[in-house]
Amino acid sequence: MGMKFQKILVLAGIVIGFLSIIVVLAGTLLKNSVPNVLAPVERHFAFDYVIVGGGTGGSTLTSLLAKNSNGSVLLIEAGGQFGLLSRIPLLTTFQQKGINDWSFLSVPQKHSSRGLIERRQCLPRGKGLGGSANLNYMLHFDGHGPDFDSWRDHHNLSDWSWAQMRSFMAAAKPKNPDMLEIPRRYSKLTEALEEAQAQFAYKDWIFRRSLYNIRNGLRHSVVQQFLNPVIHHSNLRLLPDALVKRIQLAPSPFLQATSILVGIKDEENREKEFSIELLMASGIGDVSALKKLGIPAQHSLPLVGHNLHDHFNLPLFVSMGVTGPTLNQNTLLNPMTLINYLSSGSGPLGNFGVLGNVVSYGGLGAPPYGITFFGAGAIDESALMSISNFKGPAFRALFPRYYNSSQEGFVVISSCLQPKSRGSVGLLNRHMRRNPLIDPNYLSSEEDVACTISAIRSAVELVNSTAFAALHPRIHWPRVQECSNFGPFERDFFDNRPSDQYLECLMRHVGLGSHHPGGTCALGSVVDSQLRLKGVSNVRVVDASVLPRPISGNPNSVVVAIALRAASWILKSELQAGDSK
């Protein structure tokens, strides 16, 4: 009877799987069916607000203006709708390098990425409504007050302290049931983290189980949270699959944007939201750099494109001597995995596998760092190499048991939360959408190396603790040929105390960026305290490029909060203008 029931379950899994594939394909075919599209006859209309880019900031801002403004709103987006595939959390990586990803690559890195092809990092950026919020790993961050206070203290931004931003961060947080928190008893790994929290209570470590922007097993991005509820409003129009090529400035009497070139059409408008590459292509930036590209300068802002920052990670694989459950190929191919997901939105398909993290915000001058726990035992070689740009030997050194489809384990990811390294973004030529020159300049600061080593040492302390002992963990120190002079030596596999030189070598060979870029249109240097482009009266920048310093966590929620605040200023200005008439 048991075997018969099992066969029925297997058959049911196959049938449901087939039906789900049909649904996904149908969603993919319908992905460009954007509602409320700007009609050809409307292309000569004047809009009160034009928002360029439907990413996290753009979608949030569009929602608030369409809902609360008396003016007309046009949202221009280079892509269309993401398909249903993007809604399934565990399939996030399959969205990268696809039609909804700009698929940028960094320039060859000088201080890192030696184990990557051409020493170039993959830099996914979303193309479509929701932008990178439909490519990211859906992790929510409540914010860290000292991040904002440092803007106030070090960048003369008195309007951006935690006291001013706390309410906007709270408003950015989705309410139940639009959030998923990993349960304490989700797996043996989460149970170990729970025990470690009690064991290390004397340390300054903060333990967090992952919070996801997931509802009923589906990604709940800014599209679902903000844009969809207003998408049919009469004062809103959308223009998908459209590239903005240039914004035109003119003095009247102050310098302001007067028109934008979209494809072959000009759309007149009053208030606009833009970002870095478009600014450069429009002749706004460093005049000498623009001249070399043959771009006529309209407005001098020398710091456009500078101050690029991003988090940088070192992943380490830890095998377990017990059954997880952790993500591996056998788990994913089990029919019950699909049945559980389709029936209740639960199980491995219902989140991305990041189960929790541990952070130290530092003290007595120590830099803050984070440790993330990704519950994956078997890493698919072709999938990860495609989205990471790893060379084969580097991947196989990091994940020596990748070929074992039943491998149990997890990946511990160490990173510096406030990296000091700074890079830049520039244009290869005057054509904006050619692959831009993105140089994160990872690990150019020795402080970042020291900070990440501290994170790794703490991660090892956690894995070696009695709280993790029941997992029978074993850290697999990568055998990277170029690092062999420094380790790993046999003793390193017993005491888990490899040298700093070895850890630094690992970082510079197999470390990866976090895809958290920001800073290139920074508050205080490129935009003013109300996000207005300096010297231009009616252009604001509302995305992660305005962050003057890194966020000590995932930045998506902070960008939502920034957009909420920008909307409050814009709506207040509209109200004041109405009162003065």
Swiss-Prot record:
Keywords: FAD, Flavoprotein, Glycoprotein, Oxidoreductase, Secreted, Sensory transduction, Signal, Vision. Its EC number is 1.-.-.-. Gene3D superfamilies: FAD/NAD(P)-binding domain (3.50.50.60), Glucose Oxidase, domain 3 (3.30.560.10). InterPro entries: FAD/NAD-bd_sf, GMC_OxRdtase, GMC_OxRdtase_N, GMC_OxRtase_C. FAD binds at residues 48-77. Residues 1-26 form the signal peptide. GO terms for biological process: protein localization to rhabdomere; retinoid metabolic process; rhabdomere morphogenesis; rhodopsin metabolic process; visual perception. One of its GO terms (cellular component) is extracellular region. It is found in: Secreted. It holds the Pfam family GMC_oxred_N. Transmembrane segments: none annotated. Its cofactor is FAD. Glycans are attached at residues 70, 156, 404, 464. The active site is at residue 516. Belongs to the GMC oxidoreductase family. This is Neither inactivation nor afterpotential protein G. It comes from Drosophila melanogaster.
